[in-house]
């Protein structure tokens, strides 16, 4: 190396700079791992660049080098390495070419097998636990093959269904692999599976897949079937451009090579069952011959068609018992299986060089062929022995040295002996008797995975070699008699076995034989454990975890998965190793987040925060784009110092320590003290000289720290004295010169200490200049930002100006400095400054610098003595410098980093930039932060500075630990299959008569009908057993029921009602079966014609699809509780002979297999325990139905008549049965001459019922099979549900107010009335009467700052004719929130009480009253958020005289109220919740069939539920509006639709399938023109008139009252207030049958944070009252949160506040039950809230007064403060989940992750501890433990009784309206109390 290039890092930076200068890209666009070609380097550029590099490095660099090392990182590493000699290079190449037997390292593995196996570790656990993944074929897997003629159906029915199946084979993460949904649909799922597992294997290997681009990496993939391609091309109309590549076998390997851009061999291998082991053999060969440098070997197998099953069945190869019993005497064939496995291979020398984990070593392998054996598929023992000998010869190993062989071991009676004899002959003979060859087969666990079988055995064997244990061979009980194990010196491993101790590395072989004769054997050996070299194993003090993903959601998912893993399986993996793997062994992705942590606990907490998208210490969430190029280092002046700064950096950051050490001699010389010692000892800098010198030293060292991580400045800016450090970094001064300037300046200033000062003001420059105009000695010293300035001058004048600014409610504060720089006070120092620095000889800066010293920013300063004299005197034009940098003519800079020990300027920087360039993207960062971990803070900011790719960190050579692989985000991809061609209908599905499904379009907008057609053949029945009535084969009623229930389930229903059996289905001749679902009706009919439809149809059963499928589970539970247990006096009887009982009644045989385990009879009740077959297909209810139907007919054993089902009132399905034992409970409710009626419940033991039948009616037959029909008994409504509803449906009842008792803590005596400020145009009339009562009233707004009481008299008239109710509400709301803000900012020792007066809102008859109504909701929230300043709200009659109200107001001011108060005729009323009583005034809602119904917000989650509810009540036409339009119906099938849009479309389709016409309209309900256009369009089209309204539109925007803005308020009020007013005008009273307003309990309960939302909902309540009085059926429903969806974002806040009062949220089912209940009553406003239990006699409960944990009045002030601090620390630490001792009492809560929910929880605990109610904003106003304790001490500390303590007492009695309402709940009727 020559010149200044001294290593790889320098070369990397040089190359980046070269590309930026010559190619035209920006630094942020240069990815060092991207190929030079992708960065724009052409061949011509390469020639020029090679010349530049040759000159720079002093040796020849060829352009060809750029292609051999195609990235910046690769090229820098190559050029930095010593130049190899030509001779040695040739020798290496010659040696490598001759190394054809080099060992191959296995460096990574991945797998996916049935049984939940998704990684090698899971496979190992699965094997060791002796588990099996074999089951029957999934129900839907063969559905496309169930068509065809009866003979095909018969063949399918006789085909073995045992197998080992992967779930969700249609799931694939297409987005991750950049594959369109259309292409993914046509891709063979084997291709998809291989992509995912290969990626996982590379991550397991620690090889970032992205680094393999254009590398000589080979792919060798074993696969042997392409069933998906055949299925996809069966219908030519479905073939498209993706079909060929989607179905071709070769693409299985090629697809992976294409995606990863691999340039080595890419081969799909098909040798049938040996494919994947042959793939491993070929991969090893390719590595040894240098065809590739890394190889991916794989095998994949999926079973999509029954064809191969049937073929193997025909030759007897498949096990009829469903088990692979390898080497066992009972072996009867194999079981087919699915799965995929991938291994990553390297030459062993390469793996050792690269520091890879070597899982095992492949020593040798061989492949051969059986040739002409005893048949194409018959094994050849001689060939098997030959391949074994060849493999061990290739491995250079004696056969007797192998310890274990993973055998092919399929479990065939003759195949196993042939393989065993070959193994024994070659590998077993000659072994000691006590050291036999151990053998086993993974097929006994996973089945025969065919093309993946070899790799499954290989991965198992590698794991065994690693762990030193051999998992057992399953199902081995008796040795196969044809295998002489003793003679062959072999033993089957039948238990978990320790690897034999042999004195040599563990060695094993793996065999795999293809059924066409291709044999393979691979020899592996234990890998050598790599131990870190001395010193390498030291963990860094701080670790950075880089969590990457293609999207932010993927980053979140990965972070959550890592946190779970680190707490669980990865608990023993060192944090540094986890970080190392994430940072260096995972591919870079477009999005990444980072977590910096010192220990595992911090790391897990950070990962959880990252997963949730929350801010937390050390966490940087993914950047939403890059801010652009250009980095500015900003050097602040004085003020960032703190004791302990830099100490951790000295210990943990070598670059920082080196910079301090390099600076130390110069620093000691210039400063006179040691910077190193000050930092290392955590000493505090004292005095001007020490502070300023220490800070510049710190800044210079921090600059080197940033640069060491590759972050270098393109421009520097200095703030005041910070310009010295900026000049040094820019190269204008040396460090010694910079220290000299600082020392001189500090020394000259020191004598002026105490004679001046500075203050930071929240004022812009013009305002500041006007402020100081009368103070000539005060100057504007610093232009900080558009909103901040700093003044300098004499101390007394500075303090006076601070007071003036604060009086204007603006921020002003002294700056911690004892002199006044940038002020005329410096004039006297300038001559000395010029004199002492006269010999200073600055240089031209090498880095751009903008000086803040001169008014003209374009001045090119010379940093000499004159400059520094001017610098200390002139104002600092920091704002102007930052604005110039952010928008300069030479190009804007976008990243600003403040180089300081604590950020002083970051906010000023961002304010300035956003003001100068609105909408532009900038980043403003600090470096360190006071009193935090230096290293964690710096690394966090370092990570924030990197938005395109994470910062480079050291890459130690030690192996990485395996951590969880990328979590996939699967979506469904499958072809649209058509059933095989043939005659009409298909074969019925198993257990049902359902066949091919067709959707039939209907006229107009009605939902489609559904048709299922099947052909029933006598020899291919869909059930296994027989079922004969008097010698005639009849389809059992259970199969018929199973058929229509299955159809209902496919349509989204889980219940049927009004089931009627009409005629039996004779199964002794072919029949065509049709099931038709049209709207709610479903029926089953058949025709005797076998080939085509006939007109001779017989209807067999009819039913109605249940209208409330969601209620099925609850009805099942209810029914089970009533009937699920036998009576107390029941006795267990002997089990009768079931077959005999059935035979007595003429029934022969059962269609399904089930047996009776116990029989318990008592009177009309019978409970029978039944056992189901273990292999019951998942989701099958056929056997359960069969048992229920047959046993119900036997409920009276003594009655021997034949009973046949006639009808069922309702049948409901619940949970799937999970065990073999179930209980059938029968309750006979009627028994007469005509028949019996039975209620039936079926449930597994201790589980939720899975099946319920209510009123199953049987008809008694004397002879024959003529099934009649019986009418079910009249149904009864769910009375119990309505009883529950009365517990949480309330109205507001107004009762006379009671005066608080002066003896309890809520009372107060006001003895010193204070000033009253009356705000409002109508307030003058109150003044005189209040003055007479001892108050000092004034109609004013300026007097608010001094008033004890503030009375806001609500305006009653709009500001103009065009002001709408929304405009009015926004205007008044803005006034009041500003008023609250002013009062909240007053000092705690000057409290005030806010009162609001409204008129006529209680009745809401007059328009002016309706306009004011929103204030009721706003008042409740103010009371909840600021109980300390709340007085109350009083509503006067519309015509009340304010002057006459004065005395009453004077009395009320002394009695603050939580509640809204209404004053009528001199009586003050307060609200209370009252249960709805009396007889209903109307019947339950029923919609007109000829009308339409409008739901605003109808496309939201809540609106769609309401649409379903109206449909249940007979609505046939629904108009659903939402602001976001749905796509055209032609696009509803697109896969690109997002999840939410898909949910809406599916809900609409479900409604249409029920016969409901749905019109989805994009309309803004608050916009009068939109609604008018909708109605006009309907009128033009002659649409049905709208006869009902549900106004459900609304949004939330939670903000504290003091933070509310006019725009935010309008956003919330627009749909609620504006929308309801538009609807009110469009549908006046009398024009509709009902007018429902969906409001929120927030409107009356005062939920903190929901001021605008509560206000809007109060308006809805008032509108409902107004319309009611005009005779319209209008109701405002004040909901609490709906569980699961509720009031959107506010649901949890509402639930938290309700929980505080002992209430809760409600389920949708409860909500609709309550709605139906209250709709029958004449109620305008219904409050739906679960009522808390009433308080006990002792006064405890929801309405108990707060009792403090301490008696504060008897404690000293210091004791109060100490107790409060300790108690608060305990409460806050518990909620924040940090150790109490680690909670810094001076640290802001926001830095600890405080959110609004936590704040509310802390507030509740603090209220109980302190004994008074507290403000919702308390924690934000007092953001540390110390400041909060200080605030509360003022509230509770003892002092003299005065005005102050009276107001303090006032705050203790105030609170939320929610508290008040619960305090005043009226007594419920006795039955309600009992239910409570």
Swiss-Prot record:
Location of the Carrier domain: 9-83, 1759-1836
EC code: 2.3.1.292
Disulfide bridge map: none
Pathway as given in its UniProt record: Lipid metabolism; fatty acid biosynthesis
Region entry N-terminal hotdog fold, spans: 997-1112
Molecular function in Gene Ontology: 3-oxoacyl-[acyl-carrier-protein] reductase (NADPH) activity; 3-oxoacyl-[acyl-carrier-protein] synthase activity; acyl carrier activity; fatty acid synthase activity; phosphopantetheine binding
GO cellular component term, pick one: polyketide synthase complex
Record text on cofactor binding: Binds 2 phosphopantetheines covalently.
Residue numbers annotated as active site: 273 (for beta-ketoacyl synthase activity), 408 (for beta-ketoacyl synthase activity), 448 (for beta-ketoacyl synthase activity), 720 (for malonyltransferase activity), 1027 (proton acceptor), 1186 (proton donor)
Region (Beta-ketoacyl reductase): 1491-1728
Name of the protein this chain belongs to: Phenolphthiocerol/phthiocerol polyketide synthase subunit A
Protein species of origin: Mycobacterium tuberculosis (strain ATCC 25618 / H37Rv)
